[in-house]
Structures are given as structure tokens and as C-alpha cells.
Amino acid sequence: MHYVIADPHGEYDRYRRMLDLIGFSAGDTLYILGDVVDRGGIGGIDILLDLMDRSNAVMLLGNHEAMCLKAIDQPDNQRAVSHWTRNGGQVTRDALFHLTSEERERTLDFLRSLPDHLDLELNGRRFHLVHGFPADNPHDRLWLRPGPDAESPFEDGRTVIAGHTPVCELWGADQAARYLRDLEGGHIRIFHGHGYVNLDCSCGYPFPQRRMACLRLEDMAEFYT
């Protein structure tokens, strides 16, 4: 089976519970749509180390990994360093520098090697996996924030599977509080639009409605931890 998770943001415990919930095994494939690091704690590095040791896991680059690499590779670029740390990067920076130099370079080399999109075909159905949204340039593929009316731009029927924008902010960041209030004690769910599916259920954010979402591509079954 083929499973997709987006934006774990350091929540290693939820990640481990998700693997247990879906019964992830050597015969399955896991796709992570970026933003493993930052915000949610030092667990982002633990998730990275786990993914690096799995031959059946594929990770895409997210904007937070891109910010991390720019800040680490350009330590004198105060704008890049500040941008990263303001967006939850300090916890990742601290965790990286608790690794041995060999582990740290191996981890950074892994991040540098990541693709920013991937196309799949399963059982006659086509998917385009990307962190933000399909675009002609790498920056936009990481940073674009489509709204709830977004549609797949592909004429061949590919369904876009993405994250980046928390589902509660699809209608605008100023509407997130209303979205969460309207849940009435419930939890955030995967968003299904017109050929566009968003899996970012707000891991790493400080509110109780958040959870980790996972989508099984064969039948579009949803799993949450």
C-alpha cells in the first residue's frame, strides 16, 4: 500500500503512532510531503533519522527544510537565519547541533537531495505529490498557498496531494479561529477539493484540534493520530 503524510512538524510520537495504526510494513511505501522539522519539537530530527534508514520511505522538500538549509549553509546571512528561527527553526537548529558532526552532515546531505514533487500512477489513477502546490518554479512549489476553490491544473486528471497550508487556514489565516471554533470539540480533517487534497491537519501548532493525517492512495482511506 502507498501512504502519504504531510507536515509532521516535529511530532515524532504521532508519527510513530501513525505507523502503528496503518500497520506500516516492508511491503508498503510511505511518502512525506515535507515540513518534517520545526515548530513541534526536536522530534523532527528523529523523524528524519527514521526516514533516512527506510528504503521504502520517500520524502519531498518542504519550505521549512528549505529555510533550514539556507540558514545552515549561509550562517552569515542574518535575514535567512532570522527567517528560519522566527518560523520555529530554533528547535531544529538545537537538535541538529546535538548530533555528531557526521550525523549532522548526513542529515543535511539527505535534505539537500530531496525532490520537491513526485508523480505517481496507481491502479490507473494519477497523483501529483507536492508540498505547496504545482508550479513552474521550485520556490512556488514550496510556498504557494491555494484556497479551498483551488483545482488541479493538470489536464490528464492528476490529483494534487499537498500540505503546507493548514486546512484551518485555507479560507484565510484570519478565519482559522472561526474554523476551529466551528469544530465544536472535533478535530481537523483532510480537505478534499476539485482535484486538490490537503493533508495538513496542523501538527506542530498549539491547539487541541490538531492531529496527524495520513491518506492511503489505493482507496483514499484516511487515518488520524
Mark where each language-model region is:
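N-terminal active-site segment of His-dependent metallophosphoesterases
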Residues: 1-48
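Catalytic phosphate/metal-binding cores of nucleic-acid and nucleotide-processing enzymes, i.e., regions
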Residues: 5, 77, 99, 145-154, ...
